[in-house]
Structures are given as C-alpha cells and as structure tokens.
Amino acid sequence: MIYKVFYQETKERSPRRETTRTLYLDIDASSELEGRITARQLVEENRPEYNIEYIELLSDKLLDYEKETGAFEITEF
C-alpha cells in the first residue's frame, strides 16, 4: 500500500499550508490503520524533526493521478 505523508520540515514553527511538504511510502501492512501507524513510526525514527500533519492511503485512481503529475517518488529510509 502506498501512503502519502503530509508534513512540515520543522516542529519549531506553527504549521502553514504554504510550507506543507509530502512524501510517499510503500508500506506492507494488513490494514489501513496498521499502515498509518507504521508510516508514522518510519518518519519519526528517520526524520524526528518533521511535524507530521496527516497520513493518507492512496487509492489506485489517486495513485495514478500522483504519478501523472510528476511529483510522485517513493521515499526509502
């Protein structure tokens, strides 16, 4: 399953929509909840300075759209 993680690069400032970044993770999980938990743990372990805002499971249609926009790249830690 592919998850899209919305985050701020620092926890020092209040979140602003204009500075929200995204990354994509390929998580092997048996449920959506397990995948979200695993995604959060991966990001927090590897990028503790990131302020995670939201984690979204991508549907097939949304994944295709993300690939078409050119912004899609799986992050590996």
Swiss-Prot record:
Q: Which reaction does it catalyse?
A: RNA(n) + a ribonucleoside 5'-triphosphate = RNA(n+1) + diphosphate
* Keyword Nucleotidyltransferase part of the UniProt annotation: yes
- Enzyme Commission code: 2.7.7.6
Q: What class of enzyme is it?
A: transferase
Q: By its UniProt entry, which Gene3D superfamilies does this protein fall under?
A: RNAP, epsilon subunit-like (3.10.20.730)
Pfam annotation, one family? RpoY
Q: Has UniProt tagged this entry with the keyword Transcription?
A: yes
List GO terms (cellular component aspect): DNA-directed RNA polymerase complex
Write out the function statement from the record: A non-essential component of RNA polymerase (RNAP).
Q: How does it assemble?
A: RNAP is composed of a core of 2 alpha, a beta and a beta' subunit. The core is associated with a delta subunit, and at least one of epsilon or omega. When a sigma factor is associated with the core the holoenzyme is formed, which can initiate transcription.
Report the family membership.
Belongs to the RNA polymerase subunit epsilon family.
What name does the UniProt record give this protein?
Answer: DNA-directed RNA polymerase subunit epsilon
Which taxonomic lineage is given here? Bacteria, Bacillati, Bacillota, Bacilli, Lactobacillales
